[in-house]
Amino acid sequence: MKYLTILGSTGSIGTSTLTVIKQNPDKFTVRALVAKNNFTLMTKQCLDFRPSWVGMVDKRAARELKANLAQLGIAINIISGNQAACELAALKEIDTVMAAIAGVDGLLSTLSALRAGKRVLLANKESLVSCGRLFMNEVHQHNAQLLPVDSEHNAIFQILPEPIQRQLGCLSLSKYGVSQIILTGSGGPFRQTPLDALATITSDQACIHPNWSMGRKISVDSATMMNKGLEYIEARCLFNASTDQIEVLLHPQSIFHSMVRYVDGSVLAQLAYPDMRIPITYALSYPTRVPIKVTPLNFLQLGTLSFDQPDNKRYPCLQLAIEASKLGQAATTTLNAANEVAVAAFLQRKIRFTDIASVNQMVLDKINLEEPSSIEEVLCIDRQARINAHLSIRYLAL
């Protein structure tokens, strides 16, 4: 039996995780749930899973939740505020944490879980993008275990040699016969949209992904392929890969979730229909496998599967991320922060879709490339990048 805290339980990954847990009650028990402010859904989750603890970042939402649970006659410990997630990520009574709070907001609670030596299922890619080697050092220093949940990194993890799985970020890929990691991406909803029409894309259009059901921020990142760029950076950290050891390919059907090329000419791949419950289940149950109710892959019905190179003119954010990864940690931290601000501004209709890349480029052009030596320095870089991003947005709005 594994005992869990779910960070971000009311989000897309959190709700999918709870679906998997509900199908395997003999293997997983929820001890704590954490969310920002969705007390309505949290009430239902408490009713279904009866955790011992709940954390709500928003204090008003915590009060509403407490009132709802009192009416239902359910007694649960409720804490609130910015430290709630950190406290519940380090509970003594749990061994596993699903880190699914989006953005850099999820960094501190994920670090709290690592420092408590927990098994961390990482769905928050921004933690690695922002902190890189410093983040991986926390994993090793505190004897924690890190398992990737992103479908691409989870796929890569599944088809890498076991020693690399056991010591993520430490071992040489080439020593174990790996010549290249191939990250796949659908290209999002605008893969065939005329380039001159991209500036008029609305936030609602950008949030409709052709294959995946996701939150609004990650849907926009998928449309710009910044999501793939962040995954490129994350893959370098997780798998100790050089820029020459990672390739990005467009794969519109999202059946091949990633591939690993070996020195003997073999290419191993993980295939499945697009469904986040599959990588979530693998991460939850690793190193074993447990059953879940998903549609099995039917090769006779797949039809044509295609691959292509990404177009840098269509996806400038992807190229920005690749270039930032070559510059170092200060650049990737800056890019991640700038992108979060830019995407939020786009969703609020303050800038155009094509301005997201412009904001990211403008902020990167201003950075001080001195590398951070601590998490605190990372957070300082993050704050400065956000300030510069807001200034860039004001400039574009003139």
Swiss-Prot record:
Can the keyword NADP be found in this entry's annotation? Answer: yes
| Function noted in UniProt | Catalyzes the NADPH-dependent rearrangement and reduction of 1-deoxy-D-xylulose-5-phosphate (DXP) to 2-C-methyl-D-erythritol 4-phosphate (MEP).
**Taxonomic source organism:** Baumannia cicadellinicola subsp. Homalodisca coagulata
Which residues are noted in the entry as NADPH-binding? 10-13, 38, 124, 126, 215
> Which InterPro entries does the protein's record reference?
DXP_reductoisomerase (IPR003821), DXP_reductoisomerase_C (IPR013644), DXP_reductoisomerase_N (IPR013512), DXPR_C (IPR026877), DXPR_C_sf (IPR036169), NAD(P)-bd_dom_sf (IPR036291)
| Stated name of the protein | 1-deoxy-D-xylulose 5-phosphate reductoisomerase
Q: Which reaction does it catalyse?
A: 2-C-methyl-D-erythritol 4-phosphate + NADP(+) = 1-deoxy-D-xylulose 5-phosphate + NADPH + H(+)
**Residues that, per the record, bind 1-deoxy-D-xylulose 5-phosphate:** 125, 151-152, 186, 209, 222, 227-228, 231
The pathway where this protein functions is:
Isoprenoid biosynthesis; isopentenyl diphosphate biosynthesis via DXP pathway; isopentenyl diphosphate from 1-deoxy-D-xylulose 5-phosphate: step 1/6
Which residues does Mn(2+) bind? 150, 152, 231
Q: List the keywords (alphabetical).
A: Isoprene biosynthesis, Manganese, Metal-binding, NADP, Oxidoreductase
Gene Ontology terms, MF aspect: 1-deoxy-D-xylulose-5-phosphate reductoisomerase activity; manganese ion binding; NADPH binding
A Pfam family = DXP_reductoisom
Q: What is its EC number?
A: 1.1.1.267
